[in-house]
């Protein structure tokens, strides 16, 4: 019996089973122990293969691919710390709903806890973060192929969101010519090999039913809060709220067009919060809210009913409102709960939103990151998409901009880490094939700098804006100790990104004014390559501008 040949047949069953659940993209890191999985993936023509030398970036690349494709994405890594590097992407997927299938090669059991090289305790290492965890045995003909395929089908067939960890131990030898070893074992699956359906089909998950008292609540004074959702859902939510006559507070990720812009500014005005207190019901569609003032209002509001609609399971309400947690696809839920045409009941808030936007516009001429956040709509590529980083940049765009309704916006706002942002943006571009504008801060770019290697392979123009404010200026908005702020919080690095772009043969610009920025964009959108635009700004101007606008709008 050839161990290497049977390893490959075992792996081929695993990989073929994944195709029956919509897996098309597969991300592969280099490694020896993962050879059976890698070769099985290479031989399966269903897959689109992606490679990267850094497993942490590879996990985030898969995350970006899954965000756009809405399908599970598989990742193959070797044993040891390579597996641990997938943890951040797995955590993010669990919070934002992407489906990741982590195929982690492992040493066989007799090599664990005995000093063998690159052998760690991998089963269960991700704790409760995967939706399902499978610890496979070493490949053996004593276990029928139908057990292997049905085990995978059960995990993937019941997967609605998050990750599946499939730990795959393989004994040596890992290399060798293929022979007939295990062929009869594999063939016992019969015509499954010619089919395209799972071996084991699971019943679909039950979703929340229609709320039978909706006809009653839609006649009340309501507020719609829109969190993260798809572009198509964002347009539908905007129309739904408009028909009801309810104010819509739209997050930067809602893609609703934010009909009441600058919410994070006007929610700091007592007139606005006083008017919102009249609401009898709040319907929150989507989770992962960004704005600080929005979260503060959400925590303090006490309507008669607070409904949260999202297809991700879990409470999704850090304020623990009394109400209803409705698990449903947002578009489907809107169809079951149609709006009834009513006149708007809020009078003060539309006026405050308009005045807040005018206050922002009055400051748009200075060359800074707050002004860039406001102007970002001017630079969006046609038929393209936006990827927004974390920390200060996403808060500024949320507070100061008004993104077009239905324009695709992506981010990592589950755990909201700054790790893996460039890798995720690369995945977003690859899965969509669209022109992409990505914007991150300087520390985020440094954190994932080797992901610039992934940005060499794009199918449409990609512009990466690095807002260089020399450190983590988000901490300027927090009551961090002034005496220790720079050393322990901001951590300025005093670097520029010209040489990093050159190392990966990417185009680079460092504009000094708006005209130069517009020229850089015009050049970047002409060719299907990546352009790094570094916008060097004064350290604290962005945070100070936001604070000044908050103070100004609070007194309107």
UniProtKB/Swiss-Prot annotation:
Cofactor binding summary note: Binds 1 thiamine pyrophosphate per subunit.
Molecular-function GO terms, alphabetical: 2-succinyl-5-enolpyruvyl-6-hydroxy-3-cyclohexene-1-carboxylic-acid synthase activity; magnesium ion binding; manganese ion binding; thiamine pyrophosphate binding
Gene3D superfamilies for this protein: 3.40.50.970, TPP-binding domain
Named cofactor requirement(s): Mg(2+); Mn(2+); thiamine diphosphate
Pathway: Quinol/quinone metabolism; 1,4-dihydroxy-2-naphthoate biosynthesis; 1,4-dihydroxy-2-naphthoate from chorismate: step 2/7; Quinol/quinone metabolism; menaquinone biosynthesis
A Pfam family of this chain: TPP_enzyme_N
InterPro entries: MenaQ_synth_MenD (IPR004433), MenD_middle (IPR032264), THDP-binding (IPR029061), Thiamin_PyroP_enz_TPP-bd_dom (IPR012001), TPP_enzyme_TPP-bd (IPR011766)
Swiss-Prot/TrEMBL GO biological process terms: menaquinone biosynthetic process
EC top class named in words: transferase
Residue spans crossing the bilayer: none
Catalytic activity: isochorismate + 2-oxoglutarate + H(+) = 5-enolpyruvoyl-6-hydroxy-2-succinyl-cyclohex-3-ene-1-carboxylate + CO2
Assembly information from the UniProt record: Homodimer.
Record's function text: Catalyzes the thiamine diphosphate-dependent decarboxylation of 2-oxoglutarate and the subsequent addition of the resulting succinic semialdehyde-thiamine pyrophosphate anion to isochorismate to yield 2-succinyl-5-enolpyruvyl-6-hydroxy-3-cyclohexene-1-carboxylate (SEPHCHC).
HAMAP family (alphabetical): MenD
Protein name: 2-succinyl-5-enolpyruvyl-6-hydroxy-3-cyclohexene-1-carboxylate synthase
Species the sequence originates in: Escherichia coli (strain 55989 / EAEC)
Gene, per the UniProt record: menD
